[in-house]
Amino acid sequence: MTAKLEFIIGRAGTGKTHTCLASMTKALEYEPLGRQRILLVPEHMTYAAERMLAESLTHSAGFLQAYVFGFRRLARQVLIETGGAHLPRISDIGRRILLKDILLKHEKELSVFVRSIGKRGFTDTLGRTIAELKRYRLTTDVLRAAADDTHIQGRLSQKLKELALIMDDLSARMEGRLTDQTDRMERLAAQLKDAPFLRGAEIWVDGFDFFNPQEMAIFLELFHTADTVHISLTMDGHREGSRVRVNLPENTRDTGLFARSYQTMQALTNLLVEIDPTAVPEIHLIEEQHRAQKSSLAAIERQLFGHARLAPIQDNALRLVETATPRLEAEAVASDILRLARAEGYRYREIAVLVRDMDTYAELLLPAFADCDIPCHLDAKRPSTHHPLAELLRAAAQTAWRGWGYDTVFRALRTGFFPVVAEPAADDYFSCGDWQEAVDWLENYCIAFGIRTERQWTATDAWNFVRRTIPEDTRETEQNAVRIAVEIALDAMRRRIAAPLSILTQHLRSDESTAHERTRALYDFLDQLSVMPTLEAWRAAADAEGRLADAAAHRQIWASCMTLFEQLVEVSGDDVISARDFAELLEDGLDALEIALIPPGLDHVTIASFDQNSLAGIRVAYIVGVNAGTMPRAG
């Protein structure tokens, strides 16, 4: 059986997604208990697509025979039905830890990558490179053959050989134990034909303009298995009677606006012809522009990359604003959003801010919106590198491995997890006081008396540096009595601090410990400091004060750290590992921690990536940071 193939084409804003949903809804209404109807969209669009489909089905058919999938969810469903879903999927954290472990094991065999092993973020770059090679089905044999090519010499040749070595070890370590998304995609292509729910299914594919070789292999199998496949592509066409001509300059030129979509159409057509040389795909062209209702926006959509001379259009649909700094730009956006909401009746959910350079602008837009009381949602995962718990683990581990230096000890103390302040019932100068003020007192004391070593922090004798400077006959004066009371309280404080740190140091410094034992020591350290109850208290306080992003961070960070610990044990559990190597594994894992933020409600401004977002129903869009080198992006 060969599937019927239909391309739904049209320029941006012509309603291709609406056409897919309407066609799917009509099919479900006509045959509610028939074959499966599947909508395949990019991963970041699955939620929005499910919601739109549910809204279109509200007064008609149900979801019984309908699925909304990204490739990841499709792979999971097929593997559940055909076998292979039992293997745990390695997380990004786990992959980075595993790659770091492989690099450390092969350190003596590497000559090019050895210089980068200790560099921050290298395992992330390496992991993404390997994933990209697997998506393009470039095996280690291909890499080695390329390395031996006479046209490739020196450093590049050696780099390819080392990359092949790392990929082989990664595959061997994961074989039968772990899987990742690229491996699941290979299994999806191999097992798709055995999935009962895909036999004779009708499939709509929307939101893509390109498919990598792994995805093309999946389409090859879908053309064998499904009954009908509808694929929407953003490109232009020209109607000539009953035919649609697509070989237009904007499509066929390598620099054409729709060249990528046209090449995808040709590649998919060639796949279909491989199966059935007589097959001819249908083309459904949508020409009417629905999104750009204003004349100026419609003209820009048509001529942004053209050379036609445009007559001036005064409809205020497009404004160009220049500011001196990104901070002023963020404040101007916040101010204008307030104007729209107050004076023109816009809802916040109808407004979006599109950002190309998220690292720069997220940290400026969020406080600017907070100052104006504008509810907003950052539609991107936020690194949790600087969350107090991540900082505690990093600083405490460095204290254990590098010695109890002033910087590392006080970095750990300022996270807020240590029992700095005594219990209210204790006869202590700092009981019931501000813990940050107490840490300031302790820091000043350590600076004044040069306390910088583990031996000084863990000394059994009391700290009495102040008392040594006070003559016996003046210790009863009010001023000196306070100084002595402060010193006694600081001594009790350092003992409460030193006890858990000292135990952690003993476990982490041992040369004969396994990764499991070192990870257990970190967990016991967090348990001794009551980190989980503290995070819960912080979360409740943040919720009560309306700081929903902070509440989400406190809620997720514990689970993220437990995942990190599990991956550390999974990768190197019973192997003896040096303190240095474990420190590097932990550091890489902490760098990979991320927090997914939850929208604060139904009515909020969305801050989203310019490259990848799932925005729909937006009436106003602010595009910030439109600078040379950023848009279009240099390189």
Regions found by a protein language model. Name each.
Residues 1-635:
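Polyanion-engaging groove/track-forming segments
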